[in-house]
Amino acid sequence: LQELSNKKLVLIDTSGAESLFVNSLKVQNIDLKKHLIISADCSEAAIARYFENNETWNSLLISKYSETVSVWPVINALMNKSTPLSIANENADLQTPLKNLKIRDLVVKNLKNMQLSLV
């Protein structure tokens, strides 16, 4: 990373299992901002693993977001942690603009998508 020290932004894509690499950067006193990227259809158990050990994230980004996909596990995680919601993408196409999102918007859209039935 020394050769990149003159850069304003360096993105490092790691899997959640590579926390040792991130910890080694912390030891080197490198200022890190960590952003969690999860799929819109991520399970609650998978999301909980990302927040184990009181991990702190600067923001949460949602990939594969669609207004028709139920994101209640994501909403639950955001409500239980103080991680701000950042942006979402609808597909892997880099030309597709990202969406700015707020937790309230996610809740409203998911409530509209719920199918209410009388029992």
Predicted regions mapped to residue ranges:
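NTP-binding/hydrolysis catalytic cores, primarily Walker-type P-loop NTPases
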Residues: L78-V119
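Conserved ATPase-coupling elements of RecA-like P-loop NTPase cores
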Residues: E18-L25, A45-R49, S70-P73
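Conserved beta-strand/loop subsegment of P-loop NTPase cores
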Residues: L32-I38, E55-Q95
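Structured C-terminal portions of repeat-based eukaryotic scaffold domains
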Residues: N29, I47-N54
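Generic detector of bulky aromatic hydrophobic side chains
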Residues: L9, V22, L32, W57, ...
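Switch II (G3) loop of P-loop NTPases
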Residues: L1-Q28, L36-A40
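Signal for well-folded cores of large energy- and translation-related assemblies
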Residues: Q2-S5, K26, F51-E52, S66, ...
